[in-house]
Swiss-Prot record:
Presence of the UniProt keyword Ribonucleoprotein in the record: no
Protein's name in the database: ATP-dependent Clp protease proteolytic subunit
Location, primary (coarse class): cytoplasm
Assembly notes: Fourteen ClpP subunits assemble into 2 heptameric rings which stack back to back to give a disk-like structure with a central cavity, resembling the structure of eukaryotic proteasomes.
Gene3D superfamilies to which the protein is assigned, alphabetical: 2-enoyl-CoA Hydratase, Chain A, domain 1
Lineage: Bacteria, Pseudomonadati, Campylobacterota, Epsilonproteobacteria, Campylobacterales
Length: 195
């Protein structure tokens, strides 16, 4: 990430400078931007856990603009979203592809949103393997297991059957925000912030 903007707040105790992400965190907004890897996932998980400790009853907003990334990294975010007590609302800004789309669909029911011109894409897990044939077989079996797990969760989160999810994720399956709503990955397309 390049330049990080700072904001200045005036309070009765004087001026306070925050990097923009810390300021958003004060409003219980977590930004998932870019490729999902272990480092990004650790940061997101830490922010979710921190916000739960601050107020276990108040919703958290997870804003997503991501092309996807490492499956296990994304699953650590998914598990944390389900583990913590606050509802996690998901909002797609720009794109939610692959693991980004998966996480978008995993927000609290009724609280999964997208901005109108965002793009959402689901597909099967990607992976590569090298080494001995037995090692490649082990990796292949793990990818197939993860594919089944993710398809099952997507089916639970959407209005689609497991068979339909398996068919649609066989290749890249792109949707507009409205199409993602009709598909059941999100609950509403947002035009304006109502806060």
């Amino acid at each position: 990430m390049g330049y990080i903007p700072y904001v200045i707040e005036n309070t009765d105790r004087g001026e306070r400078s925050y990097d923009i992400y810390s300021r958003l965190l004060k409003d219980r907004i977590v930004l998932l931007s870019g490729e999902i890897n272990d480092s990004v996932a650790s940061s997101i998980v830490a922010q979710l856990l921190f916000l739960e400790a601050e107020d276990p009853e108040k919703d958290i907003g997870l804003y997503i603009n991501s092309p996807g990334g490492v499956i296990t990294s994304g699953l650590s975010i998914y598990d944390t979203m389900n583990f913590i007590r606050p509802d996690v609302s998901t909002i797609c800004i720009g794109q939610a592809a692959s693991m980004g789309a998966f996480l978008l669909s995993c927000g609290a029911k009724g609280k999964r949103f997208s901005l109108p011109h965002s793009r959402i894409m689901i597909h099967q897990p990607l992976g590569g393997a090298q080494g001995q044939a037995s090692d490649i077989e082990i990796i292949s079996n793990e990818i197939i297991r993860l594919k089944g797990l993710m398809n099952s969760i997507l089916a639970q989160n959407s209005k689609q059957s497991l068979e339909r999810i398996a068919k649609d994720t066989d290749r890249d399956f792109y949707m507009s925000a409205l199409e993602a709503k009709e598909y059941g990955l999100i609950d509403k397309v947002l035009e304006k912030n109502v806060k």
